[in-house]
Each structure stands twice: as C-alpha cells, then as structure tokens.
Amino acid sequence: MVKRAVVLISGGLDSTTCLAMAKAKGFEPVCLAVAYGQRHAVELEQARKVAAAMGVTDFRVVSIDLRQVGGSALTADIEVPKDRPSDEMSHGIPVTYVPARNALFLSLALGLAEVVGSTDIYIGVNAVDYSGYPDCRPEFIRSFESMANLATKAGVEGAHFTVHAPLSGLTKADIIREGVKLGVDYGLTHSCYDPDAQGRACGRCDSCVLRKKGFEEAGVPDPTRYTESA
C-alpha cells in the first residue's frame, strides 16, 4: 500500500531536496505550498515547477495573508539586509524572520495530513548553516510533533504523527550533494528574498549568500539566475 506524506514546499533549495528525500523513502507526496504575502512570491511558481518535475500529482496552495501581521522584511516594508558578513549572519535573529511562520505552516500541514489520512509530515528546515531562526531548531520540531499527537482527532485515537526534518543536521553543501544524488534540478529552485521583477536572484541577501556558498563548497555548478550586479 502506498503511504502518503504531506511535504511543505516553498520552491527553494531545501524544501525541494526534502521532497526528493520523501520520495526516495517511498512516500507518495502531497505537496503543500503557502502563499503568505511574501515579497518573493516567485517561489510559489517555482514550487509548482519543482512538484511537476518530480511527478507530484497532488499539489495544493493555502493562502494566509501574513502582511496583516507584519514584523518581517518578507511581509512588511522593511529592507532586506544585504552583504552581511558571515559572523553577523550567525548571531541573533534577522529581520527576515517571519513570526511563528513554521508553526503556522506545520499546523496547516498537520490539518491536511489528518484529512488525507497521512501521519507523516516533511519540512525542509535547516539549522546548521543558519541558526538565526528559532523555528528551524530540532527542539522546536520535536515539540511540534508532541503537540500534533495531542491536538488532533487522529492523534488521540491512536495514530502517531511524525514530523520529518531530514535536513536539520546538514550543511547547505551536504544538502546540495544529497539532492544531486537524487536527481534534483536546482535550476528550478528559488531562494532569494529580494528578487527583481524578472525573478532573478539579488545574490546579496543572506539566503543568496548561503546558497552560493553551498554550491561552491559542494563543488556543484550554481544554476541560479542572478541579476547582472550580483
């Protein structure tokens, strides 16, 4: 019997690799993307392309307007930091943190999992290269999993939900190497927080810098379309 898993997908490098890993484990993925008012909405179109390229037949988008909440450079009129040194990137919580984003995303995935009869949820959080986001930490994932089994009908009736975060202990280079082994086309992915009108990556935000560094350290050509000034 085919086992289904809900996979949170953003169209980025990490979530795309996570999807490939879920498929490699034999799961039939139900992909869930979230339109939350993010300034880099181009990632949603890339998520569709990634899912189609991987043969996903169940792709869903849930809309939740976090611009009404604000508090982040991704959802409000706050400038996205550029050209930050690595030591600055590794300390503190950056303004690109979206308040409670992964808690919200996982809650949506949990509800969908219960509806489609799945007990497995995949999320591509990674805390090795970038430890600034509190909702990317393994302890958060474990805590959410515990909550999931207390807060759902399926959970209290004996089903056990598992939140898989297979990238949590990997560097960006490790993630890329794993994805290459699994046949991921990274040319379809988008990571930039502040792309131009053509969807090209700025090459200077934290996400772009980490992506560039990952490809360089992995020894894999970077297929990203950057702006001419990047």
From Swiss-Prot:
Binds 1 zinc ion per subunit. It is an enzyme of class 6 (ligase). Keywords: ATP-binding, Ligase, Metal-binding, Nucleotide-binding, Queuosine biosynthesis, Zinc. GO terms for molecular function: ATP binding; ligase activity, forming carbon-nitrogen bonds; zinc ion binding. It catalyses: 7-carboxy-7-deazaguanine + NH4(+) + ATP = 7-cyano-7-deazaguanine + ADP + phosphate + H2O + H(+). Its cofactor is Zn(2+). ATP binds at I9, S10, G11, G12, L13, D14, S15, T16, T17, C18, L19. Zn(2+) binds at C192, C202, C205, C208. It comes from the Bacteria. Pathway: Purine metabolism; 7-cyano-7-deazaguanine biosynthesis. Its EC number is 6.3.4.20. The keyword Glycoprotein does not apply. One of its GO terms (biological process) is queuosine biosynthetic process. Catalyzes the ATP-dependent conversion of 7-carboxy-7-deazaguanine (CDG) to 7-cyano-7-deazaguanine (preQ(0)). Belongs to the QueC family. This is 7-cyano-7-deazaguanine synthase.
